[in-house]
Every structure is written in structure tokens, then in C-alpha cells.
Amino acid sequence: MSKSEVLRKDLESKSILKVGGAFDAMSAKLVENAGFDAVWAGSFAISATHALPDASILTMTEFFDAASSMSSTCEIPIIADCDTGYGGPSNVRHMVQKYENAGISSICIEDKTFPKQNSLLE
């Protein structure tokens, strides 16, 4: 069963899904070893590893590289925070294909305009 299928099954069968946040492959592995159901590859945490605010400063490639390394390291599903989708419809389509091909189980796209303002500031 693929990690995406595991995530879908868990979402349908569990009343609560335990998802732990990570910012790189090592922290994702710690989340997995702690018994969480999935890893949240959050843009806030990934931005923080570069000493940057979560404000659309990093590129899709930088976020993708972090999430992809988590996926290749862990056996549990990765849920990737993809901010506002990194552009228009063509960008979103490209992003979805890359993340899917890398084995990322799910993505989250915020309904905000680019450049995004961190949700904690609103």
C-alpha cells in the first residue's frame, strides 16, 4: 500500500490523526519514531531553518527539496504545506506533479494571494 493510500485509509478510519511537524529529514524521522501517523512538512518550520519568515521568500524548489528528503527517509505519509501554490494554475499543476512523483502523500494549499503573509500575523 502506498503512503498516499495509507493516509487516505487513516483519514477515513481514525477519529484523530496524529501529525507531527518537521523541517528536514532528521526531524521527520524523529516524528516517525515517536509514533505519529504522518509528518507535516510545514513552510513555517522550513523557512525558519533558513532564518527567514514564512512569507513566500523560499522557492517551490527549496520547499520541495525539504519535503522530498522527508519522504525518502520516512515510511509514514508526508503532508506538505505548499503555501499559495507557487503561482498560477500552470505552476500549481507543475508543483502537484513534482510532489506526487516524489511520493509526497498530500499537499495543503492556502487560499491566499501571493506573496503570502504568515497566518499567525493575521
Locations of the language-model features?
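N-terminal amphipathic alpha-helix/helix-capping segment at the start of soluble metabolic enzymes
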Residues: 1-21, 25, 29-34
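Structural preference for beta-strand elements that scaffold enzyme active sites
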Residues: 17-19, 38, 77-79, 106-108
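Glycine-rich anion/phosphate-binding loops
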Residues: 20-25, 57-64, 84-102
